[in-house]
């Protein structure tokens, strides 16, 4: 965020039983054991903002997105990309407006691709899920994965943190280099600015 001022939201969408929520659970397990994702439809905007604001340098999962979602929550989701959470008046502090910070990655999942708001759409990177039937071997390996997650994965996150300083030192350079490479690769093609920045933000990390 210090480099880009924005961070793409990972969208997992597909039919029920395709494994999208389980992937999100696996990813959040690296930071928060036994994380329970809020259902965006029956969770208040204030509670959603609190769920995002209470963690830093981790991942928050918001589940059950639908295109019928009310406009206020869609606006809230768009703000997450910009690093801004809920905005409110603090009546105990001279009625000053306060905006909660967003210092984490966000996963948004649901059965529908978010097409109701093009501005939200451009803030997302997508993983599509379509498979809903699985072999016995796939089910066995899934159960093994869940057992590993139950034992805890945060020790692996600790190992990754050993490379934090190297990542921070090199990311700015790699971001600029990746943006330049993409500009050449896609010359003559029209790519929405947010989409371009999403691609660069992720690719620069590798």
Question: What kind of region is each of these model predictions?
Answer:
Residues 1-206:
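Phosphate-handling catalytic cores of nucleic-acid transaction enzymes
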